[in-house]
């Protein structure tokens, strides 16, 4: 997500790079480009107008017209405005000894999947979640949550057709007490569109169960429609926080930039993949940095630590072998798709595609070598390279290009040797 917006904002700011002082007309032109980029990304009109006005006022306050580095001033100002539009500081629901949360939203928003993802997330934090399939009209919705609960290893309480809120409350309380469950996640009824029966059912269930949080799940790919949904749910039911799903999609991102402003509610979580673990706390400052090409090294460092890679000592360029290269490649695969990882690095465009098949071919080349060949590529004569190409399903030319690239990489590493980190993993060692 945000590839188009990211490219447009970086292009608008980039036009000021390398220039000395700029004129007021230059600033106006840059702000016009920023406004167009926001509107094309389906950002709410009021949000876009307020955003540009804030950037203009703060840039002038920082005397951008007198600055010798106007691009840096505008970049910093846009970053702060983006961060605030997305919610400012990161926030999560406050946990108590016992917690009961509602998940509300339309069908297709990812609400039921999000319930299971939340259960898995908090299970990993030491909580004992219980999922409640509370759609009294659609047995298929209850079955979906039951299957997801089995997948993430969390029990599911299914309501019965037409069951009253009072009965649901009694059964939920009893099961939570008997099994010592301290986080109850209620997947409420979903509909294809907002209607009075749906809202009435939700309001009645809320009145009886008394949830601590009401989390509205919004599909970030639905654009301005998501904002209408958010307003309706907040007015009729009362929303305490938002979860944005499908942030890994190709949508323009307007909902993410507008939802907090329109509802006044914090964005707690973001769905970043379809996998059960594909739910992350929402960090406004990190997303703002990614959009502006500033990277998100904090998220990358977390992935490295979660994969247990930070304790592995990096080797010097002189010691680095193809065996080490293979190990690093396999380590990076544990962090996630290469395109996703590269997108977290400063200066790498959002949406950059990496040929994963080509990566697998490189891995196959190294795996087709003997331990001696991986240790010392200098012994790779013509016949050895031919054997490796055959064993890896590649060509001799591909093997030759790979060996040459590896040697060039070692030469580059030698020139960086005096810097603190060695290689990607070295960036995150404490």
Curated annotation (Swiss-Prot):
What the entry lists under SMART domains is as follows:
AAA, SRP54, SRP54_N
Q: Which Pfam families match?
A: SRP54, SRP54_N, SRP_SPB
Report which gene this protein is encoded by.
ffh
Output this protein's name.
Answer: Signal recognition particle protein
Which key words are in the record? Answer: Cytoplasm, GTP-binding, Hydrolase, Nucleotide-binding, Ribonucleoprotein, RNA-binding, Signal recognition particle
Catalysed reactions, semicolon-separated: GTP + H2O = GDP + phosphate + H(+)
Residues binding GTP: 105-112, 187-191, 245-248
Query: Which top-level enzyme class is recorded in the Swiss-Prot or TrEMBL entry?
Result: hydrolase
Name the CDD domains on file. Answer: SRP_G
What function is annotated for this protein? Involved in targeting and insertion of nascent membrane proteins into the cytoplasmic membrane. Binds to the hydrophobic signal sequence of the ribosome-nascent chain (RNC) as it emerges from the ribosomes. The SRP-RNC complex is then targeted to the cytoplasmic membrane where it interacts with the SRP receptor FtsY.
């Amino acid at each position: 997500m945000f590839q188009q917006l990211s490219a447009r904002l970086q292009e608008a700011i980039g036009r000021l790079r390398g220039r000395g002082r700029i004129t007021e007309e230059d600033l106006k032109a840059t702000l016009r480009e920023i406004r167009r980029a926001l509107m094309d990304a389906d950002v709410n009109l009021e949000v876009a107008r307020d955003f540009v006005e804030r950037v203009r006022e703060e840039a002038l306050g920082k005397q951008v017209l007198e600055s010798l580095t106007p691009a840096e001033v505008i970049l910093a100002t846009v970053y702060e405005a983006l961060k605030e539009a997305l919610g400012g500081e990161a926030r999560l629901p406050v946990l108590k000894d016992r917690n009961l949360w509602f998940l509300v939203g339309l069908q297709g928003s990812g609400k039921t999947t999000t319930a299971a993802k939340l259960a898995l997330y908090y299970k990993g934090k030491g909580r004992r979640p219980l999922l409640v399939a509370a759609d009294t009209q659609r047995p298929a919705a209850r079955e979906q949550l039951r299957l997801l609960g089995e997948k993430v290893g969390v029990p599911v309480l299914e309501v019965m057709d037409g069951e009253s809120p009072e009965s649901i409350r009694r059964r939920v309380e009893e099961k939570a007490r008997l099994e010592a469950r301290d986080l109850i996640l209620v997947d409420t009824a979903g509909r294809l569109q907002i209607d009075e029966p749906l809202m009435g059912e939700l309001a009645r269930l809320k009145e009886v169960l008394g949830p601590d949080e009401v989390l509205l799940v919004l599909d970030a790919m639905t654009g301005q429609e998501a904002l209408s949904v958010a307003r309706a749910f907040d007015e009729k039911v009362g929303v305490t926080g938002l979860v944005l799903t499908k942030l890994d999609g190709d949508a323009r991102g307007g909902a993410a930039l507008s939802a907090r402003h329109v509802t006044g509610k914090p964005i707690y979580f973001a769905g970043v993949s379809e996998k059960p673990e594909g739910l992350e706390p929402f960090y406004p400052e990190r997303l703002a940095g990614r959009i502006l090409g500033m990277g998100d090294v904090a998220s990358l460092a977390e992935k490295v630590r979660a994969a247990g890679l930070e304790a592995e000592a990096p080797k010097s360029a002189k010691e680095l072998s193809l065996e080490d290269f293979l190990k690093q490649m396999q380590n990076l695969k544990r962090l996630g798709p290469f395109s996703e990882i590269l997108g977290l690095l400063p200066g790498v465009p959002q949406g950059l595609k990496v040929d994963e098949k080509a990566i697998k071919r490189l891995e196959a080349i190294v795996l087709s070598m003997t331990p001696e060949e991986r240790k010392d590529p200098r012994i790779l004569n013509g016949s050895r390279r031919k054997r490796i190409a055959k064993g890896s399903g590649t060509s001799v030319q591909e093997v030759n290009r790979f060996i040459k690239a590896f040697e060039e990489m070692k030469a580059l590493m030698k020139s960086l040797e005096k810097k603190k980190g060695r290689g990607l993993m070295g960036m995150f060692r404490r």
